[in-house]
């Protein structure tokens, strides 16, 4: 029998499952190398942790790793039901809150190593977390794709730690009771991008679709379709970062100015950015709450011990 020690939290409604122990050794190299080793040699640990019967499509996993640098608080590898994520904003907030719960960090500034670079996370006295993300930038503006049943859809391609297609003119109602229709629409847009061969830099697949609308109380409200067809309950940290990159490129938001991004369920991130040579460096602030601490058990004779894999 195998044992996986996990701590669950949610950030604005979006769950994060931090794996404290139980995964196999992945070496002591950079997080990108360890991610590759996990995906290549031990992917069944991801499926056991994230897929049913122990997990769900909405869950994001965060494998806690020893960092390469002695000056970093932790290393992390993010994953979900579809595979692996280079970076995860809500997951980083959940990880930092979990590290505090474990007694490993106190309020202050901490460095977290991820597969796409180091991020700076500040744990505030009220236990909210600010994440200074990796570089974000717009890759392409006003990209037009044909979406069957919806006609032409125009959006921007941007990087915020993951690849996004951001759409404002979509005609959809962004509300919690409309998520099924939103997911179907966003999925059709993603399929349209694939058919048209629209990608991120170096042919990277665009696996996140982000829809925006006006919000009466905040700067914007969004719906984000993640890889694997689950939607983000939080405002999406990497998606908000990609949005800031587009706003900055269009001259619609000044450096240091606050942007309040609401999610489809109403949770909120506060964000701002600093200019950089080839894009912007975003900072996202939000809060996570602990929800469970447990040991997942994998019995040797369990036919679904490694998850229900379709």
From Swiss-Prot:
EC no. given is 5.1.1.8
Top-level enzyme category? isomerase
> Which residues are listed for substrate binding in this entry?
89-90, 208, 232, 237-238
Per the UniProt record, which residue ranges are transmembrane? none
Question: Which InterPro entries does the record cross-reference, listed alphabetically?
Answer: Pro_racemase_fam
Specify the superkingdom. Bacteria
Active site annotation, chain numbering: 88, 236
Molecular function GO terms recorded: 4-hydroxyproline epimerase activity
Q: Which Pfam families match?
A: Pro_racemase
Keywords on record: Isomerase
> Where in the chain are disulfide-linked cysteines found?
none
Question: What's the catalysed reaction?
Answer: trans-4-hydroxy-L-proline = cis-4-hydroxy-D-proline
Q: Do the record's keywords include Isomerase?
A: yes
Family assignment from sequence similarity = Belongs to the proline racemase family.
Q: Which NCBIfam families match?
A: PRK13970.1
Tell me, what does this protein do in biology?
Answer: Catalyzes the epimerization of trans-4-hydroxy-L-proline (t4LHyp) to cis-4-hydroxy-D-proline (c4DHyp). Is likely involved in a degradation pathway that converts t4LHyp to alpha-ketoglutarate. Can also catalyze the dehydration of trans-3-hydroxy-L-proline (t3LHyp) to Delta(1)-pyrroline-2-carboxylate (Pyr2C), albeit with 42-fold lower efficiency. Displays no proline racemase activity.
Q: What is this protein called?
A: 4-hydroxyproline 2-epimerase
